Amino acid sequence: QVYNWIHDSIHEVIHMNYKDLQNGTLFPQAITEFLEWCGEEYIFFTWGNQDVMELQRNMKFYNLLELLPGPVTYYDVQKLYSISYDDGTHRCALEHAIDELKIEKSKGFHRALADAWYTAEVLKKINNIIIINHPSLDVYQNPKKKKDEIHISYPDHDKYVSREFATRERIMKDREVTSTRCPVCHLPAKRKLRWFMNNPKVYYSISNCEEHGLIRGKIR
């Protein structure tokens, strides 16, 4: 419906060409039926942090974004695997995780159903407490009003998703955005190093909690 061909580099990964898709279900029908199948209560589990955003981008293109209100909470199994078996920051390929966990490779990779099955197999190897404590939030659809803002507490940090601001200056004048609380005791921390820019999109600061020590703040 949008592209008349598949780029060679994509073809090498997914081993499909445009002819394979000609008899497929059109996206508006596919996403509508998929969300109906999901029902009222569902949670997305993905491998990586791009799938939920790309899904919403496609839905927006077809004027169907109202079917999936955001921001969308989901669980990134790639991140959960790193927290469980690596350093928490490194992100590995799905096949690498399958090899490390000695899960049988009975299907090919880079196909939707097969990768979903492998992701579920990795998920089975992760402690439920780690899963529950580390939700991800896709903000392709940002909060529009103060009442819609989101606060999430993780074991080692807090996340605050604010409403949209018209300018950078307004962001940095907002007290709640620029304040810092300790992620352990949740009390206000004393600023040690004022907010500074690391690049045009990110600000950092250093604050101190008398009981729990130094805290790095980040605004992006």
Residue map of PLM features:
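Conserved non-catalytic scaffold segment of RNase H-like nuclease domains
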Residues: 1-56, 213-219
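A short, structured active-site edge motif that brings together acidic residues
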Residues: 1, 70-81
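Short aromatic/hydrophobic-glycine micro-motifs
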Residues: 16, 64, 103, 187-188, ...
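Active-site-proximal helix-loop-helix substrate-binding element of RNase H-like nuclease domains
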Residues: 5-14, 18-21, 80-116
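Acidic two-metal-ion nuclease catalytic site recognized across multiple nuclease folds
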Residues: 125-220
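Short secondary-structure boundary/hinge segments and terminal tails
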Residues: 29, 115-117, 200
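Acidic, Mg2+-coordinating catalytic module of metal-dependent nucleases/exonucleases
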Residues: 43-49, 54-58, 93-157
